């Protein structure tokens, strides 16, 4: 996910007073099936009908506004600046985060609860410019994407060191689904190119259109005596949404098992994670460490964890197109 840009956008806005390299989109990498067959099982809270609403007051030096942050969790309301670490057993986290640095509180809001006729609520993910004025004078703008994912953010964010290490990515999972199934709607910005806006200076142009995405990894993880976490990739599904569409219900995307590097649909978007896109997880000692993907598992292997994310933009830190929007609902796994 574009978590690094989300994390740094919060800090860029504060200090100006969670990256991935962009991968070209190609339609041949789409793996959508028309129908969702077999036994369907919801991911917990995956109907997005329950939301915890947080009202967080930002610091006076940047305006002192009260921002609304939506969390995928049991219904409730928080009127405080308490850190959020999950609630009610929900496995979901979002790019709506709170940071506290040097006594200054700042938020990013890029995921929203939205009513959906006949279906309760859905999740709305938006790429936007996060803005604030410092002392009412310095106007800072940073591009940030909307993301929802299985895992937990280490809130409050307190520094900009190693932003991906603020995300405990994935959850325990030992099944072998054949596909991920969900409802979705897409609105693309319509811009032929993206922009990069870091909060320092103006926006610059990045070649290529911006696309929302869904990424699913099944991993077999293990930990050594020193607390290092390793993984082999058991299953993979990567999809970029290449056109505007009204709601598509029960869209099914095949999960491919084992070494897929020789498959016709394979490109670097499906590759093992390394470098800036390396995931992190909390080890048995309570420390956040890299999840080092060291190879492809056998196609008949059983995973230990699932990594799943939806993003309104697929680019790197600070990169995207303002207005890109992805709506997601009813996330299930097909067996």
Report residues per predicted region.
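Aromatic (Trp/Tyr/Phe) and Gly/Pro-enriched flexible surface segments
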Residues: 24-177, 196, 207-258, 269-334
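Generic alpha-helical propensity signal that fires on short helical segments
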Residues: 18-19, 66, 198-202
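Substrate-binding/catalytic groove segments of enzymes
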Residues: 192, 261-268
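A generic structural micro-environment signature
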Residues: 7-9, 54, 192
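Short amphipathic, basic-aromatic surface patches that mediate peripheral association
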Residues: 184-205, 314-317
């Amino acid at each position: 996910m574009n978590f690094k840009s989300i994390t740094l956008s919060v800090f860029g806005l504060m200090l100006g007073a969670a990256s991935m390299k962009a991968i070209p989109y190609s339609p041949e990498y789409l793996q959508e099936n028309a129908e969702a067959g077999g036994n369907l099982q919801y991911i917990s809270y995956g109907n997005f009908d329950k939301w915890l609403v947080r009202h967080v007051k930002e610091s006076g030096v940047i305006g002192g506004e009260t921002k609304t942050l939506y969390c995928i969790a049991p219904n409730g309301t928080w009127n405080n600046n308490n850190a959020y670490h999950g609630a009610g057993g929900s496995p979901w986290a979002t790019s709506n985060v709170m940071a506290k640095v040097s006594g200054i509180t700042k938020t990013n809001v890029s995921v929203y609860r939205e009513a959906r006729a006949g279906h309760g609520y859905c999740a709305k993910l938006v790429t936007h410019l996060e803005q604030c004025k410092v002392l009412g004078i310095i106007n800072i703008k940073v591009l940030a994407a909307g993301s929802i994912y299985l895992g937990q953010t280490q809130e409050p964010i307190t520094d900009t060191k190693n932003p991906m290490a603020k995300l405990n990515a994935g959850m325990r999972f030992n099944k072998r689904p054949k596909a991920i199934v969900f409802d979705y709607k897409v609105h693309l910005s319509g811009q032929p190119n993206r922009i990069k806006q870091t909060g320092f200076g103006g926006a610059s142009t990045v070649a290529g259109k911006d696309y929302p995405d869904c990424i699913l990894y099944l991993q077999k993880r293990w930990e050594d005596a020193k607390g290092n976490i390793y993984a082999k990739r058991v299953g993979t599904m990567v999809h970029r949404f290449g056109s505007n569409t009204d709601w598509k219900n029960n869209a099914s995307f095949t999960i491919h098992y084992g070494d897929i590097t020789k498959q016709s649909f394979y490109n670097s978007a499906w590759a093992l994670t390394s470098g800036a896109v390396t995931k992190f997880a909390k080890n048995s000692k309570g420390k956040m460490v890299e999840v080092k993907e060291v190879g492809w598992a056998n196609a008949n292997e059983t995973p230990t964890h699932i990594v799943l994310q939806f993003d309104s933009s697929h680019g790197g830190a600070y990169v995207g197109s303002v207005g890109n929007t992805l709506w997601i609902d009813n996330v299930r796994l097909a067996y």
